């Protein structure tokens, strides 16, 4: 009797294990070029805050390449154009950074990030009148971006980025 119970128990265990061994695992999620770029930008900002500017620059360049790929696969996305403007500006190309920001604003005129970053670009290129126009758009958003841009325009704060 004990022998029969033992055999039944063993067969049950083996049957259970064989089913679990054959089950398919869930496929791993593949990160988009955009998601990889955003991650690279986060790292670049951390490096920049620590004064590791060469590492930051490499991360911005990597992010820019990923964003260009993302933009070619899925064009006219305001968030992608915002980050393209940002990385291009961070790499010192203000002219093309501005073009990306303006393309993004053509799609989404009240985009908070684009308006703030474009305002910062205008301050950096001594075009305060245009920076104030961006500030005016952010005026009613009740957001941190408005406060930061205002302080940067007023000269009471230096741009973090």
Positions of PLM-derived features:
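Residue-level recognition of tetratricopeptide repeat
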Residues: 77, 111, 143-146
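Terminal, low-structured helical/coil segments at or just beyond the last alpha-helical repeat
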Residues: 23-31, 43, 132-161
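Structural marker of alpha-solenoid helical repeat scaffolds
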Residues: 73, 107, 138-141
């Amino acid at each position: 009797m004990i022998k029969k119970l033992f055999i039944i128990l063993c067969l049950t265990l083996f049957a259970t294990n064989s089913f679990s061994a054959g089950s398919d695992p869930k496929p791993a999620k593949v990160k988009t070029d955009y998601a990889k770029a955003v991650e690279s930008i986060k790292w670049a900002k951390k490096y920049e805050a620590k004064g590791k500017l060469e590492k930051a620059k490499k991360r911005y360049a990597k992010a820019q390449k990923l964003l260009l790929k993302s933009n070619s696969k899925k064009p006219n996305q305001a968030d992608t154009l915002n980050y393209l403007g940002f990385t291009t500006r961070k790499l010192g190309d203000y002219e093309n950074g501005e073009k990306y920001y303006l393309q993004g604003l053509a799609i989404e005129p009240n985009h908070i990030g684009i308006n703030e970053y474009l305002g910062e670009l205008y301050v950096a290129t001594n075009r305060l009148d245009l920076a104030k126009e961006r500030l005016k758009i952010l005026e009613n958003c009740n957001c941190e971006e408005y406060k930061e841009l205002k302080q940067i325009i007023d000269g009471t704060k230096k741009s973090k980025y």
